[in-house]
Amino acid sequence: MLLSADDKKHIKAIMPSIAAHGDKFGGEALYRMFLVNPKTKTYFPTFDFHHNSKQISAHGKKVVDALNEASNHLDNIAGSLSKLSDLHAYDLRVDPGNFPLLAHNILVVVAMNFPKQFDPATHKALDKFLATVSSVLTSKYR
C-alpha cells in the first residue's frame, strides 16, 4: 500500500509519542489482542497474560520499536523489516492472520491515548502504515 506524503507526515508526527512509551502502548495493544483473540496466545506459552504483565510490556516494546524503525524508513519498510519478516515466517511461523488483529488493537490504543492527535487523517495514515507493515511481515509466507 502506497503511503502518500501526507500519510508520511502524520506517521512521523505521532510515532515519537507512541515510541516514547512503547512498553505501555505496545503492551496494552498485545494485552487487548490476547484478551479478545485468545488463540493468539499460542505463540507465547510462558507468558503471564495479566494486565500490565512485565512479559507483555517487554514484548510490546519490541513491537513498538519495530514500528518506530519502520517509520524511520517509510520509503523502504520492507528493507527495514526484512530480518523480522524472516523471523516470523521461517522461525516463529506466526499465523499471518494475527498481524491485522494486532494492528487493530494498536489503532485502538493510540486512539484512546492520543484523542487530539488521532484525527481522521492520522487514523487513515496509521491504518495504512500498519497494513503495510502487516503485508511486509507476511510477504515471505509462501
Swiss-Prot record:
Protein residues bound to O2: 59
Q: Which UniProt keywords apply?
A: Heme, Iron, Metal-binding, Oxygen transport, Transport
Ranges where the Globin domain occurs? 2-142
Expression by tissue: Red blood cells.
GO MF annotation terms: haptoglobin binding; heme binding; metal ion binding; organic acid binding; oxygen binding; oxygen carrier activity; peroxidase activity
Show the PROSITE patterns listed in the entry. GLOBIN
Short name of one Pfam family for this protein?
Globin
BP-aspect Gene Ontology terms: hydrogen peroxide catabolic process
- Binding of heme b, residues: 88
- Name a GO CC annotation attached to this entry: hemoglobin complex
Name the family: Belongs to the globin family.
The job of this chain, per UniProt, is described as:
Involved in oxygen transport from the lung to the various peripheral tissues.
Q: Which proteins does it associate with, and in what oligomeric form?
A: Heterotetramer of two alpha chains and two beta chains.
The UniProt entry, under PANTHER family, shows: HEMOGLOBIN FAMILY MEMBER, HEMOGLOBIN SUBUNIT ALPHA
Name of the protein described by the UniProt record:
Hemoglobin subunit alpha-1
Gene this chain is encoded by: hba1
